[in-house]
């Protein structure tokens, strides 16, 4: 078996393989000895390992025996014994890499090994799944093994209260969905006190279906939003105006990146319709924002693909699963733009209060690893962004699934008719069939074609992951036909029913190539698990979404030279190369987009870290607020100095009256020294003139040090001002990101410009926070005796 691993891993990973071979042999050598131990003696191994780690041993020192202990515990508790290949998978995870294991190879059992070892360090281990159902299932199953060995296991799901969350995070091993861990991080950094925070510092995480979490979901940031009012009339008006706009004349839409922008003619049309001179003027920023969101809603979002309308409401659809995302809405006025587009009542707009991308959240873990059936095609991204290798793990039994060559048709209608014929053929044999689609709309299209032939099927649009899992689990029964979005029910194996093995197993039909080979492979991998028979075939057309978005012109050229049969099937061989090439272009485009967005988010991530570090410092009861405020006084004076003592202007031109008024706001002194062109010729002169005033004022502020009640008051006020400024900052950053793409047309590097302008905005935000704190202290102190 291990020789087959060598071939699979290739030359570059042979050294690792030798190490795995040796370690697996060492683990196997301990099996007989451990099987002789009583349950109590086996359980006591956990205490022994913890003592060894406390005495200076490392995880590497104990991993062989610890893996053997988990294997023995799983045999006793679950009746399951880890295969050698599963031990290899566990070793890969322990090293912080990705174990690529096909469907049905027991990834859940594999995770029991590294989670146990890293949990022994006492710092907590997080096991990330793609939905609540799988988190509960895996916690209940694998949790039995860890609890048998004396560890505490917790579950972190959205429905539980903060007290339960705190308990879940205090457990040795915590199961949950990645987004909930991320939202808890954001909520902790909005907490009014330390007692409200639930998480502890991150240590080690294992992500199941890691490609889904870190790549597919990486496009969507985690956002906590509050409500703010918006103009319904303006939303409706902008939606109406946009309907009269023509593609390429008034706007451009890049289907590849799903980004839209106005052309010069479009800008002129808006200015004429609203009777304004310059849409880009600051006073028209709101109008521009409403118009660009109306344009995005009109061209980038399709009903029954990206969202559905139900009970007079816009419900967003998860593009990866086809499920409705209850309670989720788009931020920054885009949701309201969709409501206006569909003629629905406009709801309150969301204002971002805290946000983080999936990438930057998981990069906070010192150690990260993951499992999936399909990751090798994205290895470059995993390596570059997360510094993880993808290591394929061999199957316990050979894969005998037959993956048939794609068939490509000229039209979508011809394709769906061919799908129907293929369904009839395999259904007559009694074989179960799984038809994978890309969206709810496509699922319904396939269903309509099957209805025309009176074919009975199960349309999988389940409202909960649990129902999905039940339906997917029965998709392997004799004669069963299931239509599902390709990611639906992921994590649940399709077991073959009685007699199906002899008929040839599950037949999988793909109705369109995805924008990633990885997702195609996931669909194929539904069949042929654990050495079962099975087959797969993709039915494509030149009208498919991927080809329309990434190769429309090439399709038009290609069509002229194609040979087809009477059904519309393309017989020209080069069409397959064309499809494969387009898919690679698509993958590269998405990777570039994620990389670009990550570069932009890295900027705000650095800013977020500064704000959250200060915020957590403010939450500490022993933080001396006066020590924080004293430096702010100097910073605020310096900022005001820069504002009014403008470089390049003569001192006689400086506005000393406004300068004095601003200083009085933050210093609260009765007699501010006289400031004019006579005694202030530079910012340094101002510092000299104010030296005694500042010194005496700081002494008065320092006297507040002993006032405990005031310290607490200052803490709450500082948190309030900081949060308020941060929310406004996020709003400003959103608008900056919106407009930065336009700079490409000015021959400027948008990333560099974004970094520069983001820094300016951040310095303004932080400076404003410091000035507000100084004003508050000045008002509290009141006016003292005269300072001459």
Swiss-Prot record:
GO terms for cellular component: cell envelope Sec protein transport complex; cytosol; plasma membrane. It is an enzyme of class 7 (translocase). Its main location: membrane. It is a peripheral membrane protein. It is found in: Cell membrane; Cytoplasm. ATP binds at residues 86, 104-108, 493. Signal peptide: none annotated. It catalyses: ATP + H2O + cellular proteinSide 1 = ADP + phosphate + cellular proteinSide 2. Keywords: ATP-binding, Cell membrane, Cytoplasm, Membrane, Nucleotide-binding, Protein transport, Translocase, Translocation, Transport. One of its GO terms (biological process) is protein import. Its EC number is 7.4.2.8. Part of the Sec protein translocase complex. Interacts with the SecYEG preprotein conducting channel. Has a central role in coupling the hydrolysis of ATP to the transfer of proteins into and across the cell membrane, serving as an ATP-driven molecular motor driving the stepwise translocation of polypeptide chains across the membrane. Monomer and homodimer. Part of the essential Sec protein translocation apparatus which comprises SecA, SecYEG and auxiliary proteins SecDF. Other proteins may also be involved. Belongs to the SecA family. This is Protein translocase subunit SecA 2. It comes from Bacillus thuringiensis (strain Al Hakam).
